[in-house]
Amino acid sequence: MASAGDRRGGGGPPGSGDDSGGGWETVEKRVKKPAQQVGKGQWGQWNSPNAAPAPTAPRSGSGAFHHSGNTLVRHSDRRPARGTPRPPPQNRSIEAELQAPHGVVTAPLANGWQWGARSCPPGTESKEGGLPLSGCDPETDNAEGYDTSDDDNDDDMSDDLSDDYDSDASEKSFETRKNHKLFKGFFEVLEALSVEQLNEPTRQWHCPACKNGPGAIDWYKGLQPLMTHAKTKGSIKVKRHRELASLLEEELSRRGTSVVPSGEQFRKWKGLRESTDREIVWPPMVVVMNTVLEQDEDDKWKGMGNQELIDYFSEYAASKARHAYGPNGHRGMSVLIFDSSAVGYMEAERLHDHFVRQRTDRNTWNSAHKVTFLPGGKRQLYGFLATKDDMETFNRHCHGKSRLKYEMRSYNEMVVTQMKQMSEDNQQLNYLKNKMVKKEQHSKLVEDTLSVVTQKLRETMEENTIVRNKAKEKHLEYEKEMKYQEEFFHDQIEKIHKATEEKEIKFEKLLQEERAKARQSDVDSGSTEDRRQRKEKIQNFIDCQVKDVEEFEAERDKLIKLHEEKKVKLKKEYLAKEFELEKELDTALTSLMDKHKPDIFKSSTSPST
């Protein structure tokens, strides 16, 4: 498609027959919108439901395919030279449509290609879409109002892409070409999508090759219209579009998909005929001819026996053999009967193919140049799959039960369907085998894991038993030691108590002795006054002693009470400390058990099949 500024004289391409001059004629130029408006949002949304769909270019159905420019026109009535086969014109036009056209060589312009290229200061392109910013407005730079997007853009990009799209482009790596600044953002979006998302027909795309030019705001629903646009673009930025088509096709091929969505049907091809079924003899049989040997004395023909015929073709697993007999004996016609199954038919067909490969099949047997005897006198056997006519010929002289029973059945029903069923059964069998193998592996793994865990548990229990026994021994030792210490201190306390009691007894004796001395000193000698004074003195001494004894007993009671209180306090402190020790031991044992607690065995789920 060409823009309004590139309309060609006569309304058709040069060389098409519509324009006698075949040159270029500039009719008019239209003012292009600012690049900011054209490319605004181009890379922001890749799937806009409100965007208008891309216009599809109509295809010509006249049998000739026209390239843009001065390309040749191939008519459908052109015939190839004798002896040189060529594809039909329709196929050639399809190939030409799917292939990138060659570079178009047009007539030179009057002033050459010296068009004014707009200059922009460096760094004025945005990072997201590569669009010019406010400092580089196409309307202000192009004061005359000409549309330079079709001409200058191609001219500018020809220099920019000269290193990427020249004759050496095929030698560049795919990644290098894909990372070009024009396509990098587009392919980054592609890589972020899954295959299902790529094939969504409702996903809309902008053409990265049309960036900053006509068609930049067009939407293409799905990758197929975008690929068609890139392959058929024939007037502006051809190299860029062909490169995009090549890269997109390679990228989709590496992702394992194509631009044609799965399930889309064009119905433009002729396939096989609707039915390929045929009737076959059932059970499968192979007719073996020339099995006659010689005539006996009664002029009756003798021939090969049943087992001998089976032995001759033992590689093909025939189940039975029968021979045809007539009034003159053996008729030289025999059949090998195979199992009534698809495998039996495949064996019969394999034997038939063997006869065909060594040219001893039906056609050779029916020809006038068949060889019945080989050098040395041996007879050459011929064979082929049995047909209804063959079976009727075989049963010509047979009546009643001697007739070889057969029936005509559908090939698809008896062979194809059974083979498909066998294939499905085989797949199911393989699936079940793999599942069983996985289950056995899983069971083996569980068994090994259980064995390891059981062994570790057994070892742990043995270690715990040893530790427990050692702890009991230590506990007994500690109890024995504590008992010894307790007895020792009890003995010491008893000694102290006995010493105290002895001291009290001595103290009481001393008091009694002193009192007795005082009483003995009371004699009747002396005057009455002296006796009275002595009695008073003795009485005072006794009273003082009694008073002193009472004070002693009171203080003794206080000391004993204080001692008992201290003992109670000490016992409380001891019990509290003992309780703290037991609590610390319990905490330490709990922490130790948590540390050495065995892992909980969890049986893994059945492996996914």
From Swiss-Prot:
Residues 420-473, 545-584 form a coiled coil. It is found in: Cytoplasm. This is Protein SUPPRESSOR OF GENE SILENCING 3 homolog. Required for post-transcriptional gene silencing and natural virus resistance. GO terms for biological process: defense response to virus; regulation of defense response to virus; regulatory ncRNA-mediated gene silencing. Keywords: Antiviral protein, Coiled coil, Cytoplasm, RNA-mediated gene silencing. Residues 10-24 have a biased composition (Gly residues). Pfam families: XS (PF03468), zf-XS (PF03470). GO terms for cellular component: cytoplasm. Residues 138-168 have a biased composition (Acidic residues). Residues 49-58 have a biased composition (Low complexity). InterPro entries: SGS3, XS_domain, XS_domain_sf, Znf-XS_domain. The gene is SGS3.
